[in-house]
Amino acid sequence: MKYVGAHVSISGGVENAPQNAQAIGAKAFALFTKNQRQWTAKPITDAQIELFKRRMDEYGFVPEQTLPHDSYLINLGNPDAAKRQQSLDAFVDEMQRCAQLGLPLLNFHPGSHLRQVDEDQCLDLIVDSLNRALERTSGVVAVIENTAGQGSNLGYRFEHLAHIIAGVEDKSRIGVCLDTCHTFVAGYDLRTAEAYAKTMDTFEQVVGFSYLRGMHLNDSKPDLGAKVDRHHSLGAGKLGLETFRLIMNDGRLDGIPLILETIDESLWAQEIALLYAMQESP
């Protein structure tokens, strides 16, 4: 079964996310558990936690199909030790917030070398940060998102994801989220059945579908290999609708959250319905 949704607002409180997802016909959703552009946030109250969990049950959402995203400020590969520690502490706080809400996944961008160290050194710093974060927390899986390769961001090659996974000591608490726009602008084609099969076979060989815990479904404004991160509405960008039809009929992608981060949220309900309409009868 496919679980399609979108990254919904937590305006007014994290407890509002489930009803915002329900309102667009979602079967999954993503959210921030705090303001994503601030280092610290007030703790989630017991009342908020109770209401969040009650609404999850009421609207039929399952924690495993819910994909929280961490703050954009966090850089677990920051070459500056003090700044890396600040990121680590913030990441641990985000993992603890997920645990409080009963959510077993936390999606994050791997990190950036800021042109101060080489890629392998930065990947090793990310691994070290993750191992420290996992030691300080329990239960929540850290889900690495592949990136567009913009600037000095790592994670744009499947080999980067594999490097991080290889270094993480507790393999049960590491996973991957593939973003279709990021995958495409990083140089992996998805536009035809042949190209899609080749890219997914490469992912299986380098990383493995056993680690895939979610996907972000976004069309792309830039072209293949552009290494620029600009999402577009489904069918309006360079990927086109065929990519998403292939995803909706790929049995390997059953049971994980498939999350829209397309640019016009007024279209999300329509895009979710479109994706489900693409499913072919078995």
From Swiss-Prot:
This is Probable endonuclease 4. Zn(2+) 3 binds at H182, D229, H231. Keywords: DNA damage, DNA repair, Endonuclease, Hydrolase, Metal-binding, Nuclease, Zinc. GO terms for molecular function: deoxyribonuclease IV (phage-T4-induced) activity; DNA binding; DNA-(apurinic or apyrimidinic site) endonuclease activity; phosphoric diester hydrolase activity; zinc ion binding. Endonuclease IV plays a role in DNA repair. It cleaves phosphodiester bonds at apurinic or apyrimidinic (AP) sites, generating a 3'-hydroxyl group and a 5'-terminal sugar phosphate. Binds 3 Zn(2+) ions. Zn(2+) 2 binds at E145, D179, H216, E261. Pfam families: AP_endonuc_2. The gene is nfo. Belongs to the AP endonuclease 2 family. Coiled coil: none annotated. It is an enzyme of class 3 (hydrolase). It catalyses: Endonucleolytic cleavage to 5'-phosphooligonucleotide end-products. GO terms for biological process: base-excision repair. It comes from the Bacteria. Transmembrane segments: none annotated. Its cofactor is Zn(2+).
